[in-house]
């Protein structure tokens, strides 16, 4: 606690009233910054959850069991040079598939197409989220933040209410 003390020759500490006011103002400013941070964080998290939920039900293709093993066995029989290239250096193998235009066939024959589609959807969701973030930071409101707190951290809401009551009763402005 930072207090300004009057110079005194007596044996007791004499506190300047504005030191207490500065201390309480510091607490209030810190609490306000904390609540602002909670509200903006809650809004940002909620926006990401909404973006993520928008991905639900998007088609990524069916899972093909043993598709990579089947593709490799087939490649060993049809194109031994590409097979040996794949075994020695997978990066060069992918580059070779891109040059010859067989990369889409490789993705379609294996389960990698599912991963590529999922990645594409996640990147799109991330871009949409990034575009909404500046407006989210500006649109923080106590109602949405407190509703979020009560849903995900019910004791946090009670703590904030208690803190508000303590501050109201402890600080009497005349």
From Swiss-Prot:
Name of this chain's protein: Uncharacterized protein ORF174
């Amino acid at each position: 606690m930072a207090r300004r003390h009057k110079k005194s020759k007596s044996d007791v500490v004499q506190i300047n009233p504005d030191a207490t006011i500065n201390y309480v103002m510091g607490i209030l400013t810190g609490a306000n910054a904390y609540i602002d941070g909670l509200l903006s964080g809650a809004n940002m998290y909620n926006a990401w959850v909404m973006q993520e939920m928008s991905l639900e039900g998007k088609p990524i293709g069916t899972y093909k069991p043993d598709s990579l093993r089947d593709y490799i066995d087939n490649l060993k029989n049809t194109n031994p040079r590409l097979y040996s290239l794949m075994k020695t250096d997978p990066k060069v193998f992918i580059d070779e598939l891109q040059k010859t235009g067989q990369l889409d066939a490789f993705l379609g024959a294996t389960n990698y197409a599912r991963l590529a589609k999922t990645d594409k959807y996640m990147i799109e969701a991330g871009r949409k989220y990034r575009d909404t973030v500046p407006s989210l930071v500006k649109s923080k409101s106590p109602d949405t933040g407190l509703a979020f707190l009560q849903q995900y951290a019910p004791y946090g809401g009670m703590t904030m209410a208690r803190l508000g009551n303590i501050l109201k009763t402890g600080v009497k402005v005349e």
